[in-house]
Amino acid sequence: MAVSAIIVGLGNPGPRYAATRHNFGFMVLDALMERARQLGGAPKATLTGRKDLEAVTLSLPVLPGGAFAQFACVKPLTFMNLSGRAVRAALDFYKLAPTDVFVLHDELDLPLGRMRLKRGGGNAGHNGLKSINQELGSPEFVRLRLGIGRPEGRDVAGYVLEAFRGDETPVVRQVVPAAVDGIMAFFEDGLETAQRRVGGFDAVPPPLPQP
């Protein structure tokens, strides 16, 4: 079965960053892999031995009649600012186009508890997206934007590398499975249907601490 798309979770490697806001994409990708296991499309390691990425293939029942399609799920291990190199390597290996890439990433311009789905567009200051755009030579990949909120009067670079606060954790736990539902909806029903599903989700976040 040929891989039909590459799903990329953005984040930084290593336990130090595992629970940080910048690793929201990794969190959702992990949940997608668990969903695949539950549905009978267990992930299998691929592209083994590489130092720039981790990758698995998995199957999801998103075709008519509940038939399975195969996807590659990729975590860049290059650190955020060089994510595009890993995505380019996976794209070349599977001989797919930039339009076959689906990226999961944290989004400062949305509050925690909200998501948006789109194809193409700018990078909104996100260095991972900037790197992917540069390496692929095209912005026409799909992005699932996972809101983390923008802090007032604080350094953004430090904020994204902090772990979610304890009072934010219940919201994160709601967002992650809803994001997986959105991914499934995209591959099952297309962009517009998935946009409505993702855009209609709203988990109320706690207020941001004042500086």
Swiss-Prot record:
Its biological function?
Hydrolyzes ribosome-free peptidyl-tRNAs (with 1 or more amino acids incorporated), which drop off the ribosome during protein synthesis, or as a result of ribosome stalling.
Site (Stabilizes the basic form of H active site to accept a proton) location in chain? 106
Entry keyword set: Cytoplasm, Hydrolase, RNA-binding, tRNA-binding
Name of the protein described by the UniProt record: Peptidyl-tRNA hydrolase
Signal peptide range? none
Q: Where in the cell is it found?
A: Cytoplasm
Q: What is its EC number?
A: 3.1.1.29
The reply on keyword Phosphoprotein is no
Q: How does it assemble?
A: Monomer.
Give an example GO molecular function. Answer: peptidyl-tRNA hydrolase activity
- The lineage's top-level taxon is Bacteria
Q: Which cysteines are joined by disulfide bonds?
A: none
Q: Where is this site: Discriminates between blocked and unblocked aminoacyl-tRNA?
A: 12
Concerning its family, UniProt says:
Belongs to the PTH family.
* Pfam family name, one: Pept_tRNA_hydro
Under InterPro entries, the record lists:
Pept_tRNA_hydro (IPR001328), Pept_tRNA_hydro_CS (IPR018171), Pept_tRNA_hydro_sf (IPR036416)
**Keyword Repressor included in the entry's annotation:** no
Q: GO BP, one example?
A: protein quality control for misfolded or incompletely synthesized proteins
Which CDD domains does the record match to this protein?
PTH (cd00462)
- Please provide, in alphabetical order, the Gene Ontology terms of the cellular component aspect for this entry: cytoplasm
